[in-house]
């Protein structure tokens, strides 16, 4: 296949991203400053870190809407463990394991109950979110303050740069490379696509369906934990609400990136570009003085437009055939 046609959607997203940055740059010239442009990504890049493994979940025919609560649970757990005197490196490792366990719980419930993944992860979203609030209350970390007092070396980590590139953005780029290789260059990635197209056929073809699903959900949970650690480092405090605003932008990024919500198709590169597109949209509107409520409404509208547009694109032949029949009937 012609590379231009194969990556036409990704190329369109890249062009739209450049246009978006230039458009917001005309409104607020500060956004065109390379340092402002790079360091502003730290405010939203965790959306992209979670969107990458979530792409694999959606391509497999699944769904996970509990990652925001997982971020909050992992963040407050990190704070509580540190507050109890645990060495920070060990607390971070346990936090990452907790994120993976949250993903495994999702996968286990989905596989062994056969209930729609959206319903299961809706339940675990409240389970993890409630657990985070309970843990926060027990630790006396209610409100916006959370748990602070982290070492300067840790709080500086998400605010420093390497070769002029912010550390969270470097994490995102590394994750992009890892998940792109995993999704598009390995047997596991091929299995994810086949499961999304037909889980039953994949099972009859001796593809390890359950193991693959456990892996992609665990990676989403682990990515949520990584996002939690970066957010705690960035803000300097551990709070149970750190992932509260992640749901809509992250799912919008995955769908806008080209993932079919019914499974079977998707692109890591597309999700990465779409995450930047959604992030800079929010950032640009904020710098232009637009209220957060309007920014959220625009993100929701963008998601609806993309879903409807892709649905029309997928069924364009049936639509054209129906239109042709109607026109012929009128002419007759």
Swiss-Prot record:
Pfam families reported in the protein's UniProt record: BPD_transp_2 (PF02653)
Topology relative to the membrane: Multi-pass membrane protein
Signal peptide interval: none
The UniProt record lists the keyword Cell inner membrane: yes
InterPro entries: ABC_transp_permease (IPR001851)
CDD domains per record: TM_PBP1_transp_AraH_like
Superkingdom, natural source: Bacteria
Localisation: Cell inner membrane
GO molecular function: transmembrane transporter activity
Disulfide bridge partners, by residue number: none
GO (cellular component) term, any one: plasma membrane
Keywords, comma-separated and alphabetical: Cell inner membrane, Cell membrane, Membrane, Transmembrane, Transmembrane helix, Transport
TM helices/strands, residue ranges: 7-27, 45-65, 70-90, 91-111, 118-138, 162-182, 216-236, 240-260, 261-281, 288-308
Subcellular location, principal: membrane
Function text: Part of the ABC transporter complex LsrABCD involved in autoinducer 2 (AI-2) import. Probably responsible for the translocation of the substrate across the membrane.
PANTHER family hit by this protein: ABC TRANSPORTER PERMEASE PROTEIN YPHD-RELATED-RELATED, AUTOINDUCER 2 IMPORT SYSTEM PERMEASE PROTEIN LSRD
Record note on quaternary structure: The complex is composed of two ATP-binding proteins (LsrA), two transmembrane proteins (LsrC and LsrD) and a solute-binding protein (LsrB).
Family, similarity comment: Belongs to the binding-protein-dependent transport system permease family. AraH/RbsC subfamily.
Protein name: Autoinducer 2 import system permease protein LsrD
Natural source organism: Salmonella typhi
Gene that this polypeptide is encoded by: lsrD
């Amino acid at each position: 296949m012609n590379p231009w046609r194969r990556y036409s959607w990704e190329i369109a997203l890249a062009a739209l991203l450049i246009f978006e940055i230039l458009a917001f740059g005309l409104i607020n010239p500060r956004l065109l400053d390379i340092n402002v442009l790079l360091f502003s990504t730290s405010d939203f890049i965790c959306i992209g870190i979670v969107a990458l493994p979530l792409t694999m979940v959606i391509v497999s025919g699944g769904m996970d809407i509990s990652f925001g609560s997982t971020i909050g649970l992992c963040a407050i757990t990190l704070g509580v463990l540190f507050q109890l005197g645990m060495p920070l490196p060990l607390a971070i490792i346990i936090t990452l394991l907790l994120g993976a366990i949250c993903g495994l719980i999702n996968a286990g419930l989905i596989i062994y109950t056969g209930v729609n993944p959206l319903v299961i992860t809706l339940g675990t979203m409240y389970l993890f979110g409630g657990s985070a609030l309970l843990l926060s209350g027990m630790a006396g970390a209610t409100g916006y303050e959370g748990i602070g007092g982290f070492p300067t070396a840790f709080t500086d980590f998400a605010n420093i740069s390497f070769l002029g590139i912010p550390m969270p953005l470097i994490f995102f780029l590394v994750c992009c490379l890892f998940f792109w290789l995993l999704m598009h260059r390995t047997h596991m990635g091929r299995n994810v696509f086949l499961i999304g197209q037909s889980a039953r056929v994949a099972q009859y073809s001796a593809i390890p369906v359950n193991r693959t699903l456990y892996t992609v959900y665990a990676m989403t949970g682990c990515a949520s934990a990584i996002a939690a650690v970066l957010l705690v480092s960035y803000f300097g405090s551990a709070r149970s609400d750190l992932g509260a605003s992640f749901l809509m932008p992250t799912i919008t990024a995955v769908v806008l990136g080209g993932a079919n919500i019914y499974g079977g198709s998707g692109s890591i590169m597309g999700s990465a570009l779409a995450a930047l597109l959604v992030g800079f949209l929010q950032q640009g509107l904020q710098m232009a003085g637009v209220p957060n409520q309007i920014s959220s409404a625009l993100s929701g509208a963008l998601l609806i437009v993309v879903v409807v547009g892709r649905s029309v694109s997928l069924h364009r032949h049936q639509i054209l055939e129906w239109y042709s029949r109607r026109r012929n009937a009128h002419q007759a």
